[in-house]
Amino acid sequence: MNISIIIPTYNVQDYIAKCLESIATQTYTDGVECLVIDDCGTDNSIAVAEQFIADYSGPIPFQIIHHEQNKGVSAARNTGIRQAKGKYLYFIDPDDWMTNDCLEKMMNMATKYPTANLIQGNTFCNSKWARLEGKKLPAFSDDRKWIKKKFLTLNYLPTTCWNKLIKREFVVDNGLFFKEGFLHEDEMWQWGLSKTVRAIAFLLDKTYHYTILRPSGIMDTMTKKKDHFLFFVLELWVEDIDDFCKDEQIAYIFEKIRRITPNIETEEDWEHTERLLNTLSAKSKKSKRIALRIFQKSPRHLQSIRLWGSVISKLLK
């Protein structure tokens, strides 16, 4: 088996057929399997998938794997990793879809650069973070320091697991399973990826359509909830900083803090923020300059953060 496509599925009845159709019509089908992970949603997503599979008569085997209860997207992806038989894994979200030549182009890159642990694809998306154009990326790199720095430069490489063709053996050997119960599972996974990838190739052709479907009100609520979880992720990150690109990693964490501070609502999160800022300030002689440079991008953030009165005075000393 060459490629295992993994689709974590939960309450996407209006979209999953299009996702499955994009897989069924791939120009590359040699040794491809598709695993639909049923994460026990409350709509007809799985019924739609079952009907699609029943009507399909092509060469790609589709399999639905059922969870006994809802466990979340991380657990669904982990189930897919464990059940996959392919040399490569390809994650796709059920409300997204691929161009019909996606796997063919991915496998062409994998064949051309066999030492690459992963092939990073390009995406049809309005957001800069998911796109590769304009970033002067090579077709291939095995410079581990360069790879790590690029992964940890904000908005340079996509933090998501989807639209990456990645060797299953590499994922398993490095324990790159998804942290279950965390809402920032992609960023947690990306941090681990940055520290283990030895070689990477880039497919600059756009082959993946990313969709944002949820209403803005729901997204606002989710953002606040995710920001709360991000504090726990950041606390793990500050204890796992590499000397050779310390400043890049510190800047990455400071930038994350800057972006979530407007959503801080609880005493616990204020304490997390103060603890993170103080820890980072002690990590490097350049931490103070890095923090000031980043937070000066948005003066309103400084004014809204009560703890910055004391922290800024420390940074300016």
Language model features by range: what are they?
Residues 2-4, 22, 33, 188:
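Cell-envelope/extracellular polymer assembly enzymes that use nucleotide-activated donors
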Residues 12-25:
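Short, well-formed alpha-helical segments that are part of the catalytic scaffolds
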Residues 22, 38-48, 69:
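A conserved acidic beta->alpha catalytic loop
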Residues 31-40, 63-67, 94:
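Short beta-strand/loop segment that forms part of the nucleotide-sugar
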Residues 67-84:
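Glycine-rich, basic loop-to-helix element that forms the pyrophosphate-binding segment
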Residues 89:
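Short aromatic/hydrophobic "clamp" motif used to bind/position activated sugar donors
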Residues 94-200, 210-225:
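Donor-binding/catalytic cores of nucleotide-activated saccharide
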Residues 266-317:
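Membrane-interface aromatic/basic loop that binds lipid-linked glycans or pyrophosphate carriers
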